[in-house]
Regions:
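Flexible hinge/capping segments at coil-to-helix
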Residues: 1, 66-105, 191
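Hydrophobic residues within well-ordered alpha-helices
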Residues: 9, 50-51, 100, 141-147, ...
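A late-sequence structural motif
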Residues: 15-19, 165-197
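A ligand-binding cleft/hinge motif common to bilobed small-molecule-binding domains
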Residues: 44, 61-68, 122, 136-164
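Short beta-strand->loop
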Residues: 70-80, 131, 151-155, 162-176
Length: 197
């Protein structure tokens, strides 16, 4: 427990909420003198912070695109259909993408970080989205009020307080969340932290 220093982690809300707290708790039990800073951003910001040395580690749901970066898989996050509780899809065993494409779709995106549209494109479908936001809780509230349907990652839905139905998608698509870091100069504390993931 002689390790000191600070670990700066670039992350987004569902990882900060559902993945990191138990890891930090375990790490802190062994290394009480290490401090933490969590920076919240979108995926390209997070990767940029790690590349520039602003953050020691980052979490993004894809591979890093920059040079000199390494990644290790952290968790598989299934993508789920989110529909109003009174929707005909609410009781479906699995929801086909085609059924969602016919509804008013509320899209989770920020800048270029859109994991959902490619899902439809690969299936040869076009998604009709009149509403898009980066706030997953806003999406759940809108679905609850009958404004449309959406697809959200299971991690986000883990503590869903809204009156919506969450159903598996046909084919069970998922995203891979990775821990990313610079290969050249990852700090001792950050390297040790990676072992706790």
């Amino acid at each position: 427990g002689l390790m000191r220093g600070k670990i700066c982690i670039g992350t987004f809300s569902s990882v900060a909420t559902h993945v990191l707290p138990p890891v930090i708790a375990r790490f802190r039990a062994d290394h009480p003198d290490v401090d933490y800073e969590l920076l919240m951003g979108d995926y390209s910001e997070i990767e940029q912070w790690v590349a520039e040395g602003r953050c020691d580690l980052g979490f993004i749901p894809r591979e890093p695109r920059g040079a000199g970066m390494a990644s290790r898989p952290l968790v598989q996050d299934e993508l789920m259909a989110v529909v109003p509780a009174d929707s005909s899809l609410a009781t479906a065993e699995v929801v086909p993408l085609a059924d969602l494409a016919n509804e008013q779709f509320i899209l989770l995106e920020r800048g270029t970080d859109d994991e959902i549209t490619p899902l439809f494109r690969r299936a040869g479908l076009t998604v009709r989205s009149k509403l898009s936001t980066w706030d997953d809780y806003a999406i759940m509230a809108m679905v609850e009020d009958g404004l449309g349907v959406s697809i959200l990652p299971a991690l986000i839905l883990r503590r869903c307080q809204f009156d919506v139905a969450v159903r598996p998608l046909e084919g069970h698509p998922h995203r891979q969340i990775n821990a990313i870091y610079r290969t050249a100069d990852v700090s001792l504390a950050a390297a040790r932290f990676l072992e706790y993931l």
